[in-house]
Design a protein with these regions (language model features):
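Conserved SAM-binding loop
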Residues: 74-75
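Conserved class I S-adenosyl-L-methionine
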Residues: 1-35, 38-46
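Conserved SAM-binding strand-loop segment of SAM-dependent methyltransferases
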Residues: 81-92
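Conserved SAM/SAH-binding beta-strand->alpha-helix loop
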Residues: 67-69
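A short acidic, Gly/Pro-enriched loop at the edge of an enzyme's catalytic core
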Residues: 97-104
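Conserved beta-strand signature within the Rossmann-like core of class I S-adenosyl-L-methionine
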Residues: 127-134
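Core SAM-dependent methyltransferase catalytic element
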Residues: 171-187
Length: 187
């Protein structure tokens, strides 16, 4: 894990320290599905663009990432956008998530299959999950990408079976290099 942290720290040290807010199209495309208030968890938040966007929508957001530098960029972004987020530097391999603690859990461009069950149990009843990351088709254009970090076709629907699917692209189309799921928890 230490090697991963150092790699991400280097990435964010080299990044623009004051980026413009970039809203993830999956989130902005599902505004009608979001509650206007509630608690949100942004996993592998990086420089916190999704966290800041969700805070602007009225959520109390906790942004979690292994990179303290990325989270510092995110706090500055939140301040510039005149909103507030909470941040936590943590190893997502080791982090436990409280049961039924969040109305919304989001995770973009990060794949940790061990988190899947923790993300589901962290959702409150009727809570919403957003997950989007690279799938196996990404390897055609990026053959050096680690194949352990891509989703297989059908993996999301199988992993999140039992949730109410709102939007799902599960890697069937070889021209689409990311898979995503938007699903509601009903317990």
């Amino acid at each position: 894990m230490r090697e991963d942290v150092e790699r991400w720290e280097a990435k964010y040290r080299a990044a623009d320290p004051d980026p413009e807010l970039r809203t993830n199209p999956l989130l902005s495309g599902h505004l009608a599905d979001l509650y206007s208030v509630g608690s949100a968890l942004d996993l592998a938040s990086g420089s916190c663009h999704s966290a800041v966007f969700l805070a602007q929508q009225g959520y109390d957001v906790l942004a979690v990432d292994c990179s303290a530098t990325g989270l510092a960029i995110g706090r500055r972004l939140a301040q510039r956008e005149q909103t507030t987020i909470r941040t936590l530097t943590a190893d997502l391999d080791e982090m436990t998530l409280d049961k039924e603690a969040y109305d919304l859990v989001v995770c973009f461009r990060y794949l940790n299959r061990a988190l899947f069950s923790r993300m589901k149990t962290a959702l409150k009843p009727d809570g919403l999950l957003f997950l989007k990351t690279f799938n196996v088709h990404h390897l055609a254009s990026s053959p050096k990408f680690n194949p352990a970090y891509v989703l297989q076709s059908g993996e999301l629907s199988q992993s999140f079976n039992g949730m109410v699917m709102i939007d799902l692209n599960d890697g069937e189309d070889p021209k689409i290099t990311q898979s995503w799921i938007v699903a509601r928890c009903w317990q």
